[in-house]
Curated annotation (Swiss-Prot):
This is Type-2 serine--tRNA ligase. It comes from Methanococcus maripaludis (strain C6 / ATCC BAA-1332). Consists of two distinct domains, a catalytic core and a N-terminal extension that is presumably involved in tRNA binding. Homodimer. Its cofactor is Zn(2+). Its main location: cytoplasm. NCBIfam families: PRK00960.1 (NF002120), serS_MJ (TIGR00415). InterPro entries: aa-tRNA-synt_IIb (IPR002314), aa-tRNA-synth_II/BPL/LPL (IPR045864), Ser-tRNA-ligase_2_arc (IPR004503), SerS_tRNA-bd (IPR041293).
Amino acid sequence: MRFKLDGRIIFSKDVEEETQKDIVEVLENGDIFLKGVPEGKENEASKIETYEFDGKDLKLKMTSGTYTRAHEGIVRLKKPIMEKVGRKHQIGIRDVAIDRYVVTITAEPSKVSELKGLKVPECEVELEGEKINIVFENLGDGELKRNIIDRAIKFVKNELDKQDKDLTFEVCKIAPGTIVSDYKAKREITFDTDPTELAEPYGWVKRFPGRGQWFYTAPMAKLFRAFESLIIEECIDKIGFDECLFPKLIPLDVMYKMRYLEGLPEGMYYVCPPKREPEMFQDFVNEMMIKKEIPIEKLKTLLRDPAYVLAPAQCEPFYTFFDHELVDVDHPSKFFDKSGWTYRWEGGGAKGLDRVNEFLRGECVWMGTPEFVETVRDDTLKYAENLAEKLDLEYWTEVGDDPFYLEGRKTEARGIEFPDVPKYEMRLWLPHIKEERKGVAVTSANIHGTHFVEGFGIKDYKERKVWTGCTGYGLTRWVIGFLAQYGYNYDDWPELIQKKVGKLPEIPKLITWP
């Protein structure tokens, strides 16, 4: 996608020459738009093509690709401009206005022509060969905060996706996004602050240098372990899962068999083993000592080709355990793992404590007859909902629209059996998001049919049907959903959590932090 914007930042008074000079310093700092942009994608970030001062207005022409899109870029300018000139020149920003904004999506001309006559609220849609131009005019700060632009883009892309007959929609007997159950909290939820905004000032977390990673200090760790214990007691143990220790370094061949490499190749951390040549690494060390920087290019020459990924789904070792084995569906298997981190590369999508690249989960995986697999999936979801209700956490459960294992199957493969509903997703409400009702996904309950059974050559010794399923209890997200509804005041927490946590430990005592 490409974005082209004509807009204005409107100040509280005419912008004088000295003020203009300071603002120009901000405008010429391209790093403002690079935060959250993956390495190698810098040319996709916002770029100011031209600027002009006219009375109270700073007129801007901006372009971008898909990272730090132009409408996000113009908003991102407000804070550094005010930090530079607000107090110094006694000036404020009254509004951000977008006079004209063109979002261009490219697709096959035949697909574009199918959108003829498409009407999208708040904008015009223009079709031109392989281009779909979504044109907005006269948008203010209010429209930007209501995410009108993003919703319109999503709407048009969904119309395109319908033409592809996405396998999830083909397979699912209930429309993805359908809410199948919900629960309203009995108490009044008064806390409405993003928990990420308070976690660091309170000393519960500290930013780690890696993108999408955090250092969780003792109070947060205690809350994590409390939820881990509750999920095991209230959900996992009641169904009778056996704990195992799953590897987290997964060979690429395993991901290929899972078809994960087809579905989400850009969402994993790839691991390159080093060459066992100490003398070559000595050159690397010597250069680093002399230059006082890490010689990345030399390091690349010392690494073998990618051979592994860090576990992005956590259930991968389960299918490998049964690879080309004969099983007896009369003796089904139910394993769970909570032995370490799960890793997904979110790129620019990583934000706050709820969308991270490194997170904790309790992963349940099972295998048996289709009836057994469906019953277990329903139980894993039912007990998660029961736990939320015991804690008076407001939630809803919906039919998922993105079962991870279907990403690698854009068309239905002959002979593969799929369930009527591949995925249910349970979400805890996030009250601090005002524009729309948003929730953080805390439990994902999936049935794979014969997808993995076929991929790994697993058979029943009597040639009966074998299915698999998995449910992930997102420990990190359960904690964030809980804090979003209850806040950080221990006395406001439900008794069940207080008993599990016990006395909250103190935060580290430093002079300069938090």
